[in-house]
Amino acid sequence: MVIVGAGFGGLAAARELEGAPVDVTLVDRNNFHTFQPLLYQVATSGLSPSDVAYPVRGIFTRQRNLAFRRDTVVAVDWEARRVRLGGGGHLPFDRLIVAAGATVNDFGVPGVAQHGFPLYVLPDAVRLRNHILGRFEAADAEPALVDDGGLTFVVVGGGPTGVEVAGALAELIDKVLHRDFRGSRVDVARAAVILVEMTDELLPPFSPSSQRHARTTLARKGVHVRTGTSVAEVGPTRVVLAGGEEIRAHTLVWAAGVRASPLAAALGVPTTGGGRVAVGPDLRLAGHPEAFVVGDMAAIDDGAGLLPGVAQVAMQSGRHAARLVGREVVGEGDPHEAFRYRDKGTMATIGRRSAVAELPPGIRLRGTVAWVAWLGLHLVYLMGFRNRVSVFVNWAWNYLTWDRGARLILGSGEGDAERG
């Protein structure tokens, strides 16, 4: 069988099939798995890229029934039962699990693709880090840039990613860069972080009390929160809001949403809003009982609406699809059991010693307790023992010293040439 994608859903499916009497080929364009929940810490210099990525082959060193193929699946030939690879050639399959994930959705806002900084894959985080640090270096060389918005950072999207980026960026500026540029020509105190959210409240999935806590905490960190408005246009040095207001800013971080991978449209099957693929209760494709779609790419309806594109859904749906494949192969159990999502709660960190967590049945945590729970959960799910140790050491050092050791500009410079 073939599994497309080495994200949370694809890895969960592949690991579930360990020991099953099937030969598995896992295909991904990268030879590493990225722990996306911590990408914002790479972008804000808290962690290094290698801390949040782990080699795929290393994950499956002991799984004898799995082979990895570094490539991209661009189409599926249903009649011949094979996937077409971007690098040329095909892979045959008896059964297929598609877990190709999602990509950034700019909703057609003019200028976002050209001038905005997404934060969805590892190179995005490195480019954004280069750019943030580069803006301060540029302002040191030319202080007048501050008057033109050179140190104004607009974050679009008030969900967990946007809130986490805004809080971490405000702390980076206030506690680290303020110290780094002491005595330089940069007036770091004039740097500004603005968080823009289209709805009236931050963190829409959370309760009103958690939303208020997030807003209050961000304000205390110096983040300017703008709710009830959206971005209408983005230029290289300006952001125009829906009401016509113009913000002079050289940086726009786009955390406003995602859409299904382009592979969804290439499958030749019905899709829903956001390009997600419609699946049956058992996650199979209608008309293609040999194929499953899981994770962010699947429109999974649990009766109360479509499930969100989060890691929990991806992992649980990936494991479920793999279990059904195993049942079919061995001829035991129900191979068409409906998928049932078990909500384990939602968390978002707002910065040092501040987070919100809502866990079933109705448990709500805020502040330091939620922050510690957030840290522990992410360490548990992070791939690789070395990565867990490295991240823990970095977090401990940052907590004790307010230092962020990954303040490095890599590659071509500050990242402007690589924007979008």
What positions do the PLM features span?
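Beta1-alpha1 glycine-rich phosphate/pyrophosphate-binding loop at the start
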Residues: M1-A67, V74, F153, P160-F206, ...
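Short hydrophobic core segments
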Residues: V2-V4, L91-T103, V231, V239, ...
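Short glycine-rich anion-binding loops that position phosphate/pyrophosphate groups of nucleotides
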Residues: G9, G101-V104, A166, V258-A260
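A Rossmann-like FAD-binding core segment of flavoenzymes
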Residues: R64-A75, A170-P281, L285-G287, G333
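FAD-binding core/adjacent interface of flavoenzyme oxidoreductases
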Residues: L66-V154, V253
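FAD-site-proximal beta/loop scaffold in flavoenzymes
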Residues: Q114-A144, T237-V240, E246-S317, R323
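Rossmann-like dinucleotide-binding core of oxidoreductases
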Residues: D147-F206, S210-H213, H224-R226, P308-A338, ...
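C-terminal, flexible cofactor-proximal segment of oxidoreductases
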Residues: A322-G420
